[in-house]
């Protein structure tokens, strides 16, 4: 049995085996030779196939749901007796495109020594970055913010952080936008290294002020709640908070789910599909009995509770709800 990532059932592909273990193997995709009969949709995004973010855009959405249902059921069969009898299938997202409320973009280049890029990792590459300024899983405000940011820092010739040399300034751009309130939080993540270009040293505060001013001139559908600058000198290629300053506004925004309002900070966990989360949480509430009965005797434990979203949404259906979370920032939010 060989598993090949980034493929669709029914495709004819060429691949090389790069892992073997206990009678199973993993293969690395080289080329798609023939499409699957299931693929009758054109990819909605021009970056599809190059960007490593999405896998199934050439499948109609209903086929994507069937594929996911099969994958989940196989996982359940390994640990749940008679899984087929209790599995209820997949509930679809109310919105297929433009649904995300958070994106973490990475600075880099698409080819070695090429122009500054800002976006997602190229499929199969640890180093190359694709500028996803036409990405379809976010709305137009994200695309405008990304485009303005990469254009500004390109014009200033600001170096990105090289993951092998551990040199450079620009690391990530974090953008969060509430679907219901349309509030936007923008956070630039950089190192604390001196900013140097071919023309010499750059004043960081003037650079950040210019970026902030550029963002504030954008015509957006939503409203900017805050513009932030976070420092991160960790060697890991991940967004980490080693100190955040507010360049404009505040360091949080609000989102609404099922009639409740939630305060979200830059790094607190929140489901990335707000409308899909409402479906998820409403289903969970129905499972435990959405009685809204003041005499309810149930106690609900929300483990790994993050900002306590599930705990608060389930609270009308229980006498006590207890959230358990190790991340202090999420609890404080």
What would you call each of these model-derived segments?
Residues 1-47, 123:
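Terminal RNA-binding accessory module
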Residues 10, 54, 173, 227:
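Residue-level signal for inorganic ion chemistry
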Residues 10, 138, 273:
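Short, conserved phosphate/pyrophosphate- and ester-handling motifs at nucleotide-, phospho-/glycolipid
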Residues 33-43, 49-162, 180:
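Extended interfacial segments that mediate partner engagement and assembly in macromolecular machines
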Residues 127-171, 192-228:
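Internal alpha/beta scaffold segment
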Residues 167-181:
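Short edge beta-strands and adjacent turn/loop segments
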Residues 175, 182-192, 261-265:
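Short, aliphatic-rich beta-strand segments
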Residues 194-333:
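Rossmann-like S-adenosyl-L-methionine
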């Amino acid at each position: 049995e060989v598993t090949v990532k980034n493929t669709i059932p029914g495709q004819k592909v060429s691949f090389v085996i790069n892992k073997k273990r206990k009678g199973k193997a993993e293969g690395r995709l080289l080329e798609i030779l023939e499409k699957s009969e299931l693929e009758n949709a054109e990819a909605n995004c021009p970056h599809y196939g190059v960007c490593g973010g999405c896998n199934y855009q050439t499948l109609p959405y209903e086929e994507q749901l069937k594929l996911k249902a099969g994958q989940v059921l196989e996982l359940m069969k390994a640990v749940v007796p008679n899984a087929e009898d209790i599995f209820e299938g997949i509930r679809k997202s109310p919105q297929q495109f433009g649904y995300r409320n958070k994106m973490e973009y990475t600075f880099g280049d698409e080819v070695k020594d090429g122009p500054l890029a800002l976006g997602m990792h190229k499929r199969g590459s640890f180093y190359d970055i694709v500028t996803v300024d036409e990405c379809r899983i976010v709305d137009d405000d994200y695309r405008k913010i990304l485009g303005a940011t990469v254009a500004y820092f390109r014009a200033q010739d600001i170096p990105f952080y090289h993951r092998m040399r551990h040199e450079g300034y620009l690391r990530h751009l974090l953008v969060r936008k509430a679907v219901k309130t349309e509030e936007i939080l923008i956070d630039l993540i950089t190192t604390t290294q001196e900013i140097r270009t071919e023309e010499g040293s750059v004043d960081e505060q003037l650079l950040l002020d210019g970026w902030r001013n550029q963002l504030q001139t954008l015509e957006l559908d939503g409203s900017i709640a805050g513009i932030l600058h976070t420092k991160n000198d960790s060697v890991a290629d991940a967004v980490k908070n080693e100190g955040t300053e507010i360049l404009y506004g505040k360091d949080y925004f609000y989102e609404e789910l099922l009639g409740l309002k939630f305060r979200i900070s830059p790094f607190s966990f929140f489901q990335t599909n707000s409308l899909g989360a409402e479906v998820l949480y409403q289903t969970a509430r129905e499972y435990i009995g959405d009685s809204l009965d003041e005499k309810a005797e149930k106690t609900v434990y929300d483990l790994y509770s993050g900002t306590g979203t599930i705990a608060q949404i389930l609270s009308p259906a229980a006498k006590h709800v207890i959230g358990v979370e190790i991340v202090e920032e999420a609890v404080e939010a």
